[in-house]
């Protein structure tokens, strides 16, 4: 089966005025080897690849080791979305973003400002300030945030044209742990929203796309799968399926059973004598 995450021409993903061919964004860390990373990217055909300037290789053969990784990114020819992973202060975020812009020659930045090292939860108290400063400096900011409605609204208020709420803490693979909040957030905000972090299964991605989310960003679920390449394809298909289902319009849930086959009359053998 050939997997392609291309989207219909009449239903593009648009972020900061730029149109993308896919609604899947893919991280580049923790893959067993550069070859598997490359194959997974080719299978998933993502809109963008996220990469951190604060990489530290676990082993010489890791997918993120040395200059070879940067050469691989260039060879893949997929737009790179630099991130500020590992930053714990607004000052760190600004410095890292500026270095990323110079290195990759791009105004795009995935804003990550961590407030707790155990859960990797965003620092919601300083996130809006960081986003505001980056936007004033000319960045196109995609902020990693929680599903908190007020926080996301504040990010939009300071100029973020898209937000990226988590489904669950980074790397947990638990899927949407607060469906109510995520669905409410989708209902209340009109800007593009991509679920970032915590997705573990293609069904998780399909679910949030069915709710009307505009895309997903994932990494660990593919990188740590037994077969990363096949899993990348499965997620690409799931994102497409979820988007198609959302556009098709799901039936309303019912509290009681409804016969799928209409009964227009009573069979003759049921008539009383």
Swiss-Prot record:
Localisation: Cytoplasm
EC class name: transferase
Keyword line: Cytoplasm, Schiff base, Thiamine biosynthesis, Transferase
Main location: cytoplasm
Cellular component GO terms held in the UniProt record: cytoplasm
Similarity section: Belongs to the ThiG family.
Positions of the UniProt region annotated as Disordered: 251-273
Catalytic reaction list: [ThiS sulfur-carrier protein]-C-terminal-Gly-aminoethanethioate + 2-iminoacetate + 1-deoxy-D-xylulose 5-phosphate = [ThiS sulfur-carrier protein]-C-terminal Gly-Gly + 2-[(2R,5Z)-2-carboxy-4-methylthiazol-5(2H)-ylidene]ethyl phosphate + 2 H2O + H(+)
Keyword match Cytoplasm: yes
PANTHER family attached to this UniProt entry: THIAZOLE SYNTHASE (PTHR34266:SF2)
Active site: 110 (schiff-base intermediate with dxp)
Function, in words: Catalyzes the rearrangement of 1-deoxy-D-xylulose 5-phosphate (DXP) to produce the thiazole phosphate moiety of thiamine. Sulfur is provided by the thiocarboxylate moiety of the carrier protein ThiS. In vitro, sulfur can be provided by H(2)S.
A GO BP entry: thiamine diphosphate biosynthetic process
Binding positions (1-deoxy-D-xylulose 5-phosphate): 171, 197-198, 219-220
Pathway the protein contributes to: Cofactor biosynthesis; thiamine diphosphate biosynthesis
Species the sequence originates in: Variovorax paradoxus (strain S110)
Coiled coil: none
Name this protein carries in UniProt: Thiazole synthase
Binding partners and assembly: Homotetramer. Forms heterodimers with either ThiH or ThiS.
Pfam families, per database record: ThiG
Any one GO molecular function term: thiazole synthase activity
